[in-house]
Amino acid sequence: MTTKCTVMAVVLAACICLQVLPQAYGRSTQGYGRMDKLLATLMGSSEGGALESASQHSLEKRQIFDPSCKGLYDRGLFSDLEHVCKDCYNLYRNPQVTSACRVNCYSNRVFRQCMEDLLLMEDFDKYARAIQTVGKK
């Protein structure tokens, strides 16, 4: 009897997953198109040169300090900013997103788009202060 209940529960869970997954996939592809357009725009603009040099110059995987940041070194702030870029990479799985997110010490349109896509805009002021602190020139 317990085996039948377990099998029924697994089948029910699989049916629910099949109904939910296409909707989740559809929402994520809309955001993916926006990020592709933004990256393509940046490749042709003045930020594009910085983006290309950032993508050519790879930082170590675990490196938390960005040498383009000339302000106050605060490991906690760098960690918060880098966390946004890593989450954005996990959302889009595009290495250019990570490097573009770090350009100009996180002060760029890709970082802002990542914040919007990750639903972090209610914390915008916190991140803006962090960028100003670590990125003063």
Curated annotation (Swiss-Prot):
Summary of the tissues where the protein is detected: Produced by the medulla terminalis X-organ in the eyestalks and transported to the sinus gland where it is stored and released.
Modified residues (Pyrrolidone carboxylic acid): 63
Residues found modified as Valine amide: 134
Keywords: Amidation, Cleavage on pair of basic residues, Disulfide bond, Hormone, Neuropeptide, Pyrrolidone carboxylic acid, Secreted, Signal
InterPro entries noted in UniProt: Crust_neurhormone_CS (IPR018251), Crust_neurhormone_H (IPR005558), Crust_neurohorm (IPR031098), Crust_neurohorm_sf (IPR035957), Hyperglycemic (IPR001166), Hyperglycemic1 (IPR000346)
GO biological process, one term: neuropeptide signaling pathway
Principal location: secreted
Claim: Plastid is one of the keywords in the record: no
Localization (cell): Secreted
Superkingdom: Eukaryota
UniProt cross-references to PROSITE patterns, sorted A to Z: CHH_MIH_GIH
Record bears the keyword Membrane: no
Disulphides: 69-105, 85-101, 88-114
Signal peptide: 1-26
Molecular functions per Gene Ontology: neuropeptide hormone activity
Role noted for this protein: Represses the synthesis of methyl farnesoate, the precursor of insect juvenile hormone III in the mandibular organ. Also has hyperglycemic activity.
Family, similarity comment: Belongs to the arthropod CHH/MIH/GIH/VIH hormone family.
Protein's UniProt name: Mandibular organ-inhibiting hormone
